[in-house]
């Protein structure tokens, strides 16, 4: 909650109730966007270099070639994914600013219509006309609060964090790099690619399983199901790349 919103809340809430709020702490998970970026980065970082390494191993490439190509892919993938996260966040910012300007103009141009929309929104929550009329009138006296209300409850938009774009870019890129080096580790230690690919499969599938379990835990889905699904997708991708390389080679 921003300082401005906190000020509004403290002014409008009775002292006794404000005291209760000040001494009450709710344990909610509030890092959803960061977790989403980590999931995107790690899942792609584990899967894409894993499939590439398996495909090159299937084509009988040496460990040094697989490692070189893998590192190049991790670097390019991290930049690409990070840039994608940055552009997506900037698009959200632009969309919010555009909709806020439009809503602000409507509040000035057609205030009666906008007030009717406030009443309609409140009525959807089972609030009677005699109960929501004071709320509508109070919002009309405070244009900024009125605008915030319409943005949240009519359009369902939350104001983006201005730091979100860079945060998303770096989080996704770093997560991609961390995930991408796991399937490449065996190629750093084992000179024969066909031996390295076996170790890579074991290590990466285990990492995918652990990652899938953690993803399920944080997203609220069934952890074991998420773990098996994530590992299965990685196995399919690497097997397809390996088999395709063998087919092309022959």
Swiss-Prot record:
Keyword hit for Transmembrane helix: yes
Presence of keyword Transferase: no
Residues that, per the record, bind Fe cation 3: 106, 114, 117
Miscellaneous comment in the UniProt entry for this protein: Can mediate sequestration of iron ions into vacuoles when expressed in the yeast ccc1 mutant. In seeds, iron is strongly localized to the provascular strands of the hypocotyl, radicle, and cotyledons, but completely absent from these cells in vit1-1 mutant. In dry seeds, vit1-1 mutation provokes the redistribution of iron in cortex cells of the hypocotyls and in a single subepidermal cell layer in the cotyledons.
Localization, UniProt: Vacuole membrane
Keywords from the named record: Ion transport, Iron, Iron transport, Membrane, Metal-binding, Transmembrane, Transmembrane helix, Transport, Vacuole
One Pfam family from the record: VIT1
Family: Belongs to the CCC1 family.
Membrane topology: Multi-pass membrane protein
Vacuolar side: 59-64, 191-192, 249-250
Highest taxon, organism lineage: Eukaryota
GO molecular function: manganese ion transmembrane transporter activity; metal ion binding
Name of the protein: Vacuolar iron transporter 1
Chief site of localization: membrane
Expression (tissue specificity): Highly expressed in developing embryo and seed. Expressed in young seedlings, predominantly in the vasculature.
Signal peptide, first to last residue: none
Any one cellular-component term (Gene Ontology): vacuolar membrane
Protein's organism: Arabidopsis thaliana
Protein purpose: Vacuolar iron transporter involved in the transfer of iron ions from the cytosol to the vacuole for intracellular iron storage. Involved in regulation of cellular iron homeostasis. Vacuolar iron storage is required for seed embryo and seedling development.
GO term, biological process aspect, one: intracellular manganese ion homeostasis
């Amino acid at each position: 909650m921003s300082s401005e919103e906190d000020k509004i809340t403290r002014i409008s809430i009775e002292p006794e109730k404000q005291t209760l709020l000040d001494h009450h702490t709710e344990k909610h998970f509030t890092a959803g966007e960061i977790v989403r970026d980590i999931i995107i980065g790690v899942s792609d970082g584990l899967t894409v270099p894993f499939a590439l390494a398996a495909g090159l191993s299937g084509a009988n490439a040496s460990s040094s070639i697989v490692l070189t190509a893998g590192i190049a892919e991790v670097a390019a993938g991290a930049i690409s994914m990070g840039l994608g996260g940055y552009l997506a966040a900037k698009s959200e910012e632009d969309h919010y600013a555009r909709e806020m300007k439009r809503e602000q103009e409507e509040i000035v141009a057609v205030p009666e219509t906008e007030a009717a929309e406030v009443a309609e929104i409140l009525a959807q929550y089972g609030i009677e006309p005699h109960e929501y009329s004071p709320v509508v009138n109070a919002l009309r006296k405070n244009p900024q609060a009125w605008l915030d209300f319409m943005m949240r409850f009519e359009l369902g938009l939350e104001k983006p964090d201005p730091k979100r774009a860079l945060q998303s870019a770096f989080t996704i890129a770093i997560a991609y790099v961390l995930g991408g080096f796991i399937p490449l580790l065996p190629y750093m230690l084992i000179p024969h690619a066909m031996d390295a690919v076996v170790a890579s499969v074991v290590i990466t599938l285990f990492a995918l399983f652990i990652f899938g379990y953690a993803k399920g835990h944080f997203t609220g889905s069934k952890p074991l199901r998420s773990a098996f699904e994530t590992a299965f997708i990685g196995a399919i991708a690497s097997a397809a790349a390996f088999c395709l390389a063998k087919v092309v080679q022959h």
